[in-house]
Amino acid sequence: MCIEVIRLGKQPVFFDIDGTLLDYQIGINDILPSCQHSLDRLRQSHPAFIASGRTKCFIVDEILNYPFDGFVTCNGAYVEYKGQCIYKKAISKTAISHALQVADALGAVLYLESHDCIYVHHAHLPSHAIFAEKWRMHDHIVVTDFDPATIEVY
């Protein structure tokens, strides 16, 4: 991605979602028309990317419906350019196992993000329902029954 973009002499521009393009706290639930117009103009000379701590399946339709050139998700652990994965750094199985043990010991919800879903450990806890509602986490992306030894998360 970077090589192709630099070869073309175009510097990519990165945008966050929460509090930047959208702000649910103040009622901005979609990309504002003025912002879309600015993005359209920007994309004439620079690729526009989303850069988010969210995984792609957790990015709301209001963002996905705009033709961004790429996505840097999971805080940089998964990168797409023009719909293709160009980089991913999976969390080790050992780290996943340890995180699950810590969540068990604390009685806490744990979110493990993959590209296509979010594995939720202890989804029955009230804090998950509160988090899911606040951040518009759709049920169809949540997986609660999983084998930690077989998942790839970032």
Predicted regions and their residues:
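A short, hydrophobic secondary-structure junction motif
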Residues: 18, 49-51, 147-148
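Asp-based phosphoryl-transfer active-site loop
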Residues: 11-27
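Flexible, charged surface loops at secondary-structure boundaries
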Residues: 6-8, 43, 104, 151-153
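Hydrophobic, aromatic-enriched interface-forming segments
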Residues: 119, 140-154
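Active-site phosphate-binding/coordination module
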Residues: 32-130
